[in-house]
Amino acid sequence: IQLPRTFEEPMGLAIDGDRMAVATKHSIVLLANEPCLAPTYPRQPGTYDALYVPRSVHFAGALAVHDMVFTDQGLVGVNTLFSCLFQLDPRHSFRPVWKPPFVSALAPEDRCHL
């Protein structure tokens, strides 16, 4: 059982089937449901029907991610600090995929607070 208090400043959440992503202060944690483990959770056997287990962590820095969604192209999130929508990038903190036309440049300035 993953409790909200075990994530540092959770702000964004995406759920799609057995996948879940949680945006925290400095990272995005990807979890997967392991329903076969839930009934045997040691502290309260027979209580739960889902158990989301952390599978990977993407260290993105303090992007202030407020919302996310799983798409056919991968996880897309709202990057409030850089005023854009983004996808995770294995080499960089993020890859911008859209910004409002009135935002002249990507900068860590929260220019429009998406």
Predicted segment positions?
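Structural signal for beta-propeller blades
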Residues: 28-30, 83-87
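Beta-rich catalytic cores
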Residues: 9, 16, 64, 81, ...
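Short coil/turn segments that connect the beta-strands within blades of beta-propeller domains
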Residues: 17-18, 72-74
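Short loop/turn segments that connect beta-strands within beta-propeller blades
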Residues: 34-36, 89-92
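Beta-propeller domains
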Residues: 1-6, 19-48
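Conserved beta-strand positions in repeat-built beta-propeller and related beta-rich domains
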Residues: 22-26, 70, 77-82
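Surface-exposed loop and turn segments in beta-propeller and other repeat-based domains
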Residues: 3, 38-61, 93-114
